[in-house]
């Protein structure tokens, strides 16, 4: 039996506390403990949540989603769609500037959209439908489509990775498969690259020339007023160190407190423990389709009888069942497209013996399975430990490799075999909003080299995803979602491990925290 407290001690034993940054009064600086080290600063290149969160601070978007998840104008003053739905005419708000004080122009937006369209799951949909984009003048541009797509505004404004970050044309012309090196942004915060120390601190200063909308904040839409001169992300991978910092008023906000420490934090009179992201995070076990053994669908299927989602969730976030939800299928539980089609593969009786027999019959040849594990993210570390244990118990030859999250993000881009630095499997989580519908659900993509890490080729899933885009009503969408789920149980591009419902913790001196999704830093004030 694997116990969570043992996992916590093992994952934190070798970690040391970072030096706390100083230099500004607490009244004008927000001290935030993020979920992990900032491994990349390119919110188009990376799908990591930590990079997306960074991107939402540094870059603005043309549209933003309100609390009702409907797109609203953000950088745009307005837009018009032609009667045939093929031409979208966009007009920028006046006075928009990049962090180098250069004006935001139509051609910057076009270049940014083009780069994003090569990497993002919905951006790729735009790439298929795009006829052309052209600037009409510095403040206006057109997007011309081959066929109507009512979801374009939602895609351009969604807060999920990868965001359509608006950056200067010279930067946006960087190959989408190469990371940018210039972080001149358009958002309410300016990233201080000169003060960044990986594994220690990331610094964001309020961009004084940012033109916030003169209206109330509405999740990712509306005004984005900033009430702090500086936000410091203080990297603390050791949960005990982070907890002590929050209790001792050396930090204001902890994004991902460890479940074992929640009772202690709840008893502290100066700390609020609150769920910010109502949709939660779907845990997934992801496979590499390019190399043995998981290039063999029978090997992937062999794991299904051994997966007990409750065991995974208890290891990840504890036995308090308000912090997780099972069962979980392909789509986020509680959302309109969540369904029970074929779910008995995960909810039926669990059997290690059945899994062993299936693996023996699959043709598995004892190939080495490199399971990557992120030591600085306890939820992911614990999911990986349980997954590796299950694999070993049914007969896999597992090589469990621990690394920090940033290293894992880099390594999972390696498409080579395991003896050339590649990998076989890893565990991660996807935000509930991302995996609530087929359009933004990266783990179900089957478009080969352009798919998410693992790179599966699954024509049937691509066909069903295309059908979902064309669905005339919710009933049709639900039928397609059920078909998608059935195909996932056959192809097994990933295995859902349950829905994590993690709270955040912040000091009572912090108020007006924006709820509904990720940690956001506009509108937040010190009481």
Task: List each language-model region with its residue ranges.
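Surface-exposed binding/hinge segments that line
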Residues: 125-197
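Structural transition elements
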Residues: 189, 322-361, 375-382
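Ligand-site clamp/hinge motif
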Residues: 212-264, 397
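Ligand/substrate-recognition segments at binding pockets and active sites
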Residues: 238-239, 257, 352, 356-432, ...
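Periplasmic-binding protein-like
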Residues: 290, 294-335, 382-383, 488-496
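Extracytoplasmic/peripheral linker and loop segments enriched in polar/acidic and small residues
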Residues: 348, 399-413, 439-508, 527
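Long beta-strand-rich cores associated with HINT superfamily self-processing modules
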Residues: 506-527
């Amino acid at each position: 039996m694997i116990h969570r407290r043992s996992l916590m001690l093992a994952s934190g034993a070798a970690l040391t506390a970072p030096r706390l940054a100083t230099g500004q009064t607490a009244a004008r600086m927000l001290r935030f403990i993020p979920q992990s080290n900032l491994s990349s600063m390119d919110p188009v290149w990376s799908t990591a949540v930590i990079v997306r969160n960074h991107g939402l601070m540094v870059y603005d978007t043309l549209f933003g989603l309100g609390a009702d998840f409907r797109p609203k104008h953000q950088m745009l003053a307005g837009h018009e769609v032609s009667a045939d739905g093929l031409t979208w005419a966009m007009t920028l708000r006046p006075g928009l500037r990049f962090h180098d004080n250069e004006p935001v122009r139509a051609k910057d937006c076009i270049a940014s959209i083009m780069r994003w369209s090569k990497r993002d799951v919905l951006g790729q949909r735009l790439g298929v439908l795009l006829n052309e984009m052209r600037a009409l003048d510095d403040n206006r541009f057109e997007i011309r489509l081959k066929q109507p797509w009512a979801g374009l505004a939602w895609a351009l404004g969604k807060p999920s990775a990868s965001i359509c970050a608006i950056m200067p044309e010279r930067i946006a012309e960087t190959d989408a498969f190469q990371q940018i090196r210039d972080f001149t942004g358009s958002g309410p915060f300016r990233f201080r690259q000169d003060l960044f120390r990986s594994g220690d601190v990331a610094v964001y200063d309020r961009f004084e020339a940012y033109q916030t909308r003169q209206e109330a904040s509405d999740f990712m839409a509306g005004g984005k007023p900033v009430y702090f001169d500086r936000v410091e992300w203080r990297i603390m991978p050791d949960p005990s160190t982070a907890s002590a910092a929050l209790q001792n008023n050396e930090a204001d906000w902890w994004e991902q407190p460890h479940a074992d420490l929640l009772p202690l934090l709840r008893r502290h009179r100066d700390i609020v423990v609150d769920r910010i992201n109502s949709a939660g995070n779907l845990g997934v076990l992801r496979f590499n389709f390019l190399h043995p053994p998981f290039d063999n669908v029978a090997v992937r299927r062999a794991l299904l009888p051994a997966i007990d989602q409750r065991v995974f969730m208890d290891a990840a976030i504890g036995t308090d069942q308000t912090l997780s939800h099972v069962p979980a299928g392909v789509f986020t539980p509680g959302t309109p497209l969540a369904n029970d089609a074929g779910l008995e593969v995960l909810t039926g009786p669990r059997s290690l013996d059945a899994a062993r027999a299936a693996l023996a019959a699959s043709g598995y040849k004892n190939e080495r399975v490199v399971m990557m594990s992120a030591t600085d993210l306890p939820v992911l570390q614990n999911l990986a430990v349980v997954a590796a244990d299950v694999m070993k118990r049914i007969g896999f030859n597992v090589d469990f490799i621990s690394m920090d999250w940033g290293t894992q993000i880099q390594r999972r881009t390696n498409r080579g075999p395991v003896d050339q630095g590649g990998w076989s499997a890893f565990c991660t989580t996807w935000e509930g909003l991302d995996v609530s519908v087929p359009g933004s659900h990266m783990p179900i993509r089957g478009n080969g080299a352009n798919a998410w890490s693992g790179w599966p080729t699954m024509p049937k899933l691509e066909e069903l995803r295309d059908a979902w885009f064309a669905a005339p009503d919710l009933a049709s969408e639900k039928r397609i979602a059920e078909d998608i789920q059935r195909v996932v149980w056959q192809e097994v591009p990933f295995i859902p491990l349950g829905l994590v419902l993690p709270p955040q913790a912040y000091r009572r001196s912090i108020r007006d925290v924006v709820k509904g999704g990720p940690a956001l830093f506009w509108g937040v004030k010190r009481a």
